[in-house]
Amino acid sequence: MPGVLAMILAGGEGTRLQPLTITRSKPAVPFGGSYRLIDFVLNNFVNSNILRIFVLTQFKSQSLYMHIKNGWTVNGIPGCFIDQLPAQMRMGKRWYDGTADAIYQNLTFIKHNDPEHICVFGSDHVYKMDIRQMLEYHKANNAELTVSAIRVPIDKAKAFGVIQVNKKGRMIGFEEKPKNPKHIPGDPEHALVSMGNYIFKADILYRELERDANNENSSHDFGMDIIPALYPKHKVYVYDFLTNKIPNEKNVGYWRDVGTLDAYWSTNMDLLTNKNLTLNNKSWALHTYYPPLPPATFLNYRNKQVSIAQSNISAGCEIVGAKIDKSIIGFNCKIGPGTEISESIILGEAKIGKNCIIKRAILDKYVEIAPGVVIGEDLEADKSRFTISPNGIVVVPKGAKIGFE
């Protein structure tokens, strides 16, 4: 799409997702068996025919770098690219210092592409969005900044930027992560919050970033600094995510922030139980890096019948005489006879021995489980070995070898 440049903020450290983010950045965390979190925003841009994309990386970016390098390319299409921009200290000996500073440090690359409109989007939310529709709304209002927004329960709003709008959709109030969020007029149970997706007129963004960079008291963050400075004096409009339409899908406002282990687990489970999150819409294909693996194999073993119910099983898996229920199994996992896995996420490359029990757990990549190990039945016992989320999800770190002592 001419005149439009996408900037994806993908430097998130994701401390609340540890141990899943010990060796990778938050956008690189695997999701749904075959994807990574960043795939959702990349698909939103590509499916919207916005094919000039910069991905800004910083923390533990090697896993993310390889995923994008291997799985995302628009080579051969003139003027189109998906390029990664790691922190390069172009503005002095410092890393990206806030979301706004990350864009500011890359103004040279942005201006070289001479865009009229610049999309600044996050990379760690699960949702589908035709960004062209938000862009049309932005242009129709001659907005200098447009912020996408969604309704959330009032008790959850304090984790987001809370917005007030007038009847024409113009922003008239904004508070970043307030202690006492303001509800939507006439709806005391909900607040309108920012999704962290912005479309700027290029000249406005340049000017505001320069102003912010020279403010020693700024945290250089879009939510904390840029938006509060803009909306009182400039045309800042709010795009209602509920109006967005994806072909062959009904939009009920499915959008998830997977910033915690419990949110990550429940959003993965939505793939199995929530019809509002689907991966098989051919009209809105979800691309990713797909390794060259054979189809999954399911084998009975003596008197042990393999059983798979309400689960997603990825390529390369070999499941022998095991029972899998309400679970997501990533690439190339080997699961032995007599093992029972339920309400769990196995991120890939796991080796799980025979007669194991795994319940309500997340196993990171390259985990090896000895025969007979039980995980998730006794949380008190599990606390001495693993991370336990507030809702009782057991998390086994990458590369762990369990039960071989």
Residues of each region from the PLM?
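Short aromatic/hydrophobic "clamp" motif used to bind/position activated sugar donors
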Residues: 118
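Left-handed beta-helix
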Residues: 1-5, 203, 211-405
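N-terminal glycine-rich phosphate-binding loop and ensuing alpha1 helix
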Residues: 1-73, 77-80, 90-92, 137
